[in-house]
Amino acid sequence: MPYLSQTNAPIEEALVRMKRARLVPFDVPGHKRGRGNPELAAFLGAACLDVDVNSMKMLDNLCHPVSVIRDAEHLAAEAFRAAHAFFMVSGTTGSVQAMILSTVGRGDKIIMPRNVHRSAINALILCGAVPIYVNPGIEDTLGIALGMRTDDVAAAMERHPDAKAVFVNNPTYYGICSDLRAITEKAHACGMKVLVDEAHGTHLYFSDRLPTAAMDAGADMAAISMHKSGGSLTQSSILLCADTMPLGYVHQIINITQTTSASYLLLASLDISRRNLALRGREVIDRIIGLVAYARDEINAIGDYYAYGRELIDGDAVYDFDTTKLSIFTRATGLAGIEVYDILRDDYDIQTEFGDIANLLAYVSVGDRPKDIERLVAALAEIRRNYRKDPSKTLKMEYIDPVVVCVPQDAFYAEKESLPIQETKGRICAEFVMCYPPGIPILAPGEEITDEILTYIRYAKKKGCQITGPEDMSIQRLNVMTER
C-alpha cells in the first residue's frame, strides 16, 4: 500500500482518474453516465452521474477490497482510532445488524437496553438471539428514557453469565450517554463483547469536550452514521472494529446482507467526509457546540420550552450528555413535540429532525449557520405566542417498559391473527409498532400489549406522529400471536 495520509481520499482520487480515462461504458448502470436518461441528468447533474459507476479494477470492489477501498477504509480506521473500518452502503441499520449477527446466533443471549433502534431487534429476528433487556430509567419531567445504569448492566451480567455480548446506545437520540468505559470493562471481565450503536455519535471522535467515543472506551465494535453528523450522503455508514474481532468473519457477515452493487457516490462521500473530519473536525465540532449552546440559552429565555443539557448529568443513568444535541421539551407550551415539528415545517419552512410526544430535536451539524439558529429561535418564540395551550392534557411518557413474553424471532414467525387494535389488550404482539423517527419500538414482537401502550399509540396518532411497523399501515389492526 502506498504511503497515505489523512489529506488523501483514495476513492475520490480513483474516480477522478477514471473520468480522465474517458472510458466507453459497456457495463452497468444503464444510464451510461447520464446520456441514456437526460431527465435524470438534468435533475442530479452530469457531475453526479459521471461517477455513478459500477465496480471495476481501478475502483476496487466493496465486497472484496484490495486497493482504493481498502486504502480508504484504512484511513477511516486511523481517523476513528479503530483497528479496522468497514464502509457500509446500507445505512447504520446495516452496520448495527452486522455487529449483532457477527457476535450472537440462535439461542445466544445479548444484554441491551430496550430503547434500541428497530435495526437491533430486527437483527434478533434474523439470528434468533435472546435479548436480555436492561430497562433504562425515565427522566420524570421529560418522560424520556435515560441511559443504562452500570449496576443494572452488571446485575444482568451476573444473572446471565452465558451472555455473549452487551449492546449500548452512545448517545441516545436525545443526547444521553451511559458510562461506556465502566460497562465495557465489566463486560470484558465477563468475557462478553461490547457493541455500540453510535449512529448519533460520529462527531464524538473529534472533540475533547464531548462524551467518550466507543473506540476510546475499548468497545469491540461501533456503528457510526457518517451521514448524520459527519457530512456524508444519506445511507452511508461505517462499522468500526477493534482488534478483538475476527475481521474476516465480520466481512463475511456484512456480505450476506449488503448489496453487491455498492454506490460509488456513497463510498466517495464517506471518503471525502472522513478527510474533512480528520483535517477540520475539531474546529467544526467546536463551532457546533458553540452554536447549540447559544441556541439552548436563547430558547430557554423564551419561556415554557426547555432545551436541556449537561444539567441532567447524574454520574449514572445520565453519565454524560452530548452537547451538540438540541433537544427541546415542549410540554409546558401545551403542544406535543410533533405538533411543534409540524408547525415549524408547515408555517415556517423549518424542517427539524423529529418531534415526539413531548420533545423536539433540531439536529445541528457541519452544515448549519448562525442565521439558521436565529430563524429557529424566532419561530419557536412565535409558536409559543400564537399556539400555546393548556398543558394539563398532554401525555407524559415517551418510553414505556415492555412486558416481554417471548423472543422476537419466535413471535415474528409464529402463527398470528389480525385484530382490531382496541381488541388486542393482553395479547402478544407479533410485529413492530413505532414512531419514526426515531424508530425505537413502542411494541416489538414478543411483547404484551397493555392499556398503557394502547393509550400511547392512540395519543401519538392523534397528535400526528408517523407510526410505522404494522402490516396494516392505517394502524387500525395489529398482528398478534394466535392463542393456543
Give short role names for the model-derived ranges:
Residues 49-94:
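Conserved N-terminal alpha-helix of the aminotransferase class I/II PLP-enzyme fold
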Residues 294-469:
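Conserved C-terminal alpha-helix-loop-beta "cap" of PLP-dependent enzymes
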Residues 87, 133-135, 224, 354, ...:
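Structural signal for conserved beta-strand scaffold positions within catalytic alpha/beta enzyme cores
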Residues 466-484:
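Charge-dense polyanion-binding interfaces
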